Amino acid sequence: MEGVTQFFQQDAQLAELLLDYICHTLYADKTAAGEPVNILKVWEGPQFLSSFDRRQEGYARYEEQGLIRTVETIGPADHSNAESSMTEVTADILASYEEGEIDAIWCCYDLYARGVYAALKEVNQDIPMVSVDICNADIEKMAEEDSPWKACATTNWSYNGEFGMRVLALELAGEYDQILDPMTGQASNWLELPASLVTHEMVSAGGIDVSNLDTVAGTAYSDRSWMPTTGWMTELLGD
């Protein structure tokens, strides 16, 4: 949009981090043997939501490389109660597949993932699942012993608002050349915030929520090197 600065999560990267984890951690042997990992995909289809479409771009790259095969794509039948709807839809779909036909479940959105999680518990199937975005309810479910919910991909929530305020301050100061896209390092009015992977192992000890996620989520989650700044801002804020 001409003349308007926009910033987003790096949605394609969110999708790719999860698929990389599936292919190279959960199913490393299968991937090394050149076999695609069979994915039940939870997604809405094109043009439902722009962020979902950007996540699809990352997903599509793994399909194109032959690293994954989409067994089926599902989504909620009732958006007024999407979580419960996903539980029903997922349970019905799982009943139509034999054990081992689905290697993992990839979810474009954590609200839908909570419904998938409930379905896996309901039908007592041990299929690993991953999702985009994170909240305290997700962390609680991921932290359970033997949880099927293996990973979430997310940006650092505490940084997102600060990033927006720094960008606004730089615009008010007329320093547009200091507003850099974190993913490219180039001045831009289209800005994408980098993603991190949070795994079951990181939160399984308990006592973790989004307020202290930085204590277990690794250096990528806590990295601030891409935060926009300039001389006067560093003097005022310290970085």
Task: Explain the meaning of each model-derived region.
Residues M1-F8, N38-W43, V71-E72, D103-C108, ...:
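Structural recognition of the beta-strand scaffold that forms the well-ordered cores
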Residues G3, N38-K41, Y59-E83:
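Short beta-strand elements in bilobed, periplasmic/extracellular small-molecule ligand-binding domains
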Residues Q6-V37, S84-T87, C135-D138, T155-E175:
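Hydrophobic alpha-helical segments within soluble ligand-binding/sensing domains
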Residues L14-L18, L49-R69, S85, V89, ...:
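Short, solvent-exposed amphipathic alpha-helices that sit
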Residues P36, V42-W43, F163-D239:
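Hinge/cleft segment of the Venus flytrap/periplasmic-binding protein
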Residues W43-D53, C107-D110:
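Extracytoplasmic "Venus flytrap"
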Residues G58, G75-K141, G161, M165:
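Hydrophobic alpha-helical
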